[in-house]
Every structure is written in C-alpha cells, then in structure tokens.
Swiss-Prot record:
The modification N-acetylthreonine is found at T2. Its EC number is 1.10.3.9. The D1/D2 heterodimer binds P680, chlorophylls that are the primary electron donor of PSII, and subsequent electron acceptors. It shares a non-heme iron and each subunit binds pheophytin, quinone, additional chlorophylls, carotenoids and lipids. D1 provides most of the ligands for the Mn4-Ca-O5 cluster of the oxygen-evolving complex (OEC). There is also a Cl(-1) ion associated with D1 and D2, which is required for oxygen evolution. The PSII complex binds additional chlorophylls, carotenoids and specific lipids. One of its GO terms (biological process) is photosynthetic electron transport in photosystem II. This is Photosystem II protein D1. Pheophytin a binds at Y126. GO terms for molecular function: chlorophyll binding; electron transporter, transferring electrons within the cyclic electron transport pathway of photosynthesis activity; iron ion binding; oxidoreductase activity, acting on diphenols and related substances as donors, oxygen as acceptor; oxygen evolving activity.
Amino acid sequence: MTAILERRESESLWGRFCNWITSTENRLYIGWFGVLMIPTLLTATSVFIIAFIAAPPVDIDGIREPVSGSLLYGNNIVSGAIIPTSAAIGLHFYPIWEAASVDEWLYNGGPYELIVLHFLLGVACYMGREWELSFRLGMRPWIAVAYSAPVAAATAVFLIYPIGQGSFSDGMPLGISGTFNFMIVFQAEHNILMHPFHMLGVAGVFGGSLFSAMHGSLVTSSLIRETTENESANEGYRFGQEEETYNIVAAHGYFGRLIFQYASFNNSRSLHFFLAAWPVVGIWFTALGISTMAFNLNGFNFNQSVVDSQGRVINTWADIINRANLGMEVMHERNAHNFPLDLAAIEAPATNG
C-alpha cells in the first residue's frame, strides 16, 4: 500500500493531466479531441455573437459596396447574418495579422473566415470525441459515423463550395435570411432541385422524419401496461430495468396487417440500424451533391426537351423551373454583374447603319 501511494505522489503533472482528460468518470467527457474542440468552438461562438451584434458592413462582392449584417447596423434576428469574406480576398487565408488594421479586416469580412474555420475544426473534433468516448466505454463506433452526415454537410457549404467557386464570398452567410439567400442563389446557378443527390437527401430527411414518427407512435401504442388509469404511462418505466417496456410482437403484428407482413421489422436491432442509416445516407449524398456542384457539375437540364412536329417548344416543368432560375440569377448580385452568364450574349448584336 505504501509503494502505491508513493507512486501516485510521484506521478508527473502531465500524467495526472492525461488521466483526467481521458477519464470516463468526469461529468462531461473531455478526451484528446476535446482539448482541441473546446477552444475552437468557444472561439467560433464568441466571435459569432460579437460580430452578429456589432460587426460593421462588409464589402462582400469586392466592389466597394458594403453590406450590413449586424444588429447594431439596422438588422433584426431574421435579417441579420455574418457576411462572408469579401470576393477581393478570394480563398486567401485572412487572419487579423494579414490585414493592415482591424478596420480593414472587418471591412473585408475577416470574422466569417475565422468563425467558419474554427467551427469546422470544432465539429470535426466533436465527432472524434464521440468516437473516443465510445471506444473508452467499449461501445461500437456508429454514433460518430452518424454525426459525420451533418459534419459533411457543413463542410460542403462552408468550405468545399467556396473552394470550387474560388472565393469565400460564395460561402453560406451565417444567418437565417442569409441561409435562404444562399439556397435561392444555389438553385439559380446550379439547378440543385434537379440533382439526384439532392433528391436522395430530401428522401433521407423527410423519410427519416416519417420513420421516426412511425416508430415512436408504434412503441407508444404498444407499451406494456404497468400503471393504473389514474397514472401516467411513463411511470411504468424504471431506468435500467431489464424487462421490455413495449411489446414488439404486437407492434410488428399491427404494422404487418396495416401495410403487409414484410414491411414490418421483426428484429429490433435491424430496425434501429435502418432508422439511423436512412437519414444519414441521404445527407451524405446531399453533401456529395453540393461538393460536385461546387465545381459546376450541376443538376439535370431538361430545358426545351419537348417540341411539336413544327419544332415549336412545348414547355414542361423543367422550362418553368429554368425561367425561375433565370429570374433569381438576374436579381442576385445585381450591382456586380450587368447580366448573369446565362443571359449574356456570346456576340454583340449586329446594328444597321
């Protein structure tokens, strides 16, 4: 016993730090990924809050026409946003020390790069921390795998898309209306609604919502009665109990008769794998779609695909969508371009006289 106490006392400060960092007895697990996650997410969050409240207007298009995004410069919670870094900066790494002054850094949208790069590093470390805690507890690694879907989606819109388009100014603004503006412009320039990977993402999100509601309602409807009519059904469950809290056979029988037998899972493990995999795979595909459209491999183009015997175009919904795309493209960045590329003439029209 004496030897053990002496060994503990002689343990280095670094050793005690390592044990504390990797201990699963802490109220919140830190882990080695947490060592990087905590400062990066704190930095991103702090700068976001300060910039959302007080950042001056940013010259997003690089044409000396600053755009206001903060609350103190006339915005509200819905219209406010962290304006992306200026097109004049492009993809250059733009920390504070690269600018001539803090005023110049703010004018060129430096906070956007700072927030986005710290945020992406932070959420990637959060994913690693999920794996690390699972590993230390002897669990399987699928929690981190599932979280990789939103990490991939965030990386696609904040990093891959700006790289493909050549400027951080094309990244998604950090705000409510800025997100909607990004979506509208993305549709105008890339026809994302006609991209099969986006369709898979929609199926993943809507399907995941449907399956979650179906599963929750089936379980809630087939609980094993443990309470009286005067008590909440929730009182019939005790945390950690070994007995099943609902009758999976009853749920399986109900759903099998409602649809057909093989539409219902008879294995709880495969059911829950399916519930996790469906939305995750869908969002993976959407992130992959954004990453390919970043390099202008766009959605399907079926414009003017149907013509009559005289060669006249019979409009389809694809043509209606195309007309909407052109309208949206005309309206965005209206001071930076005379015409969007789709509407610009290849050659100047001939004139008489």
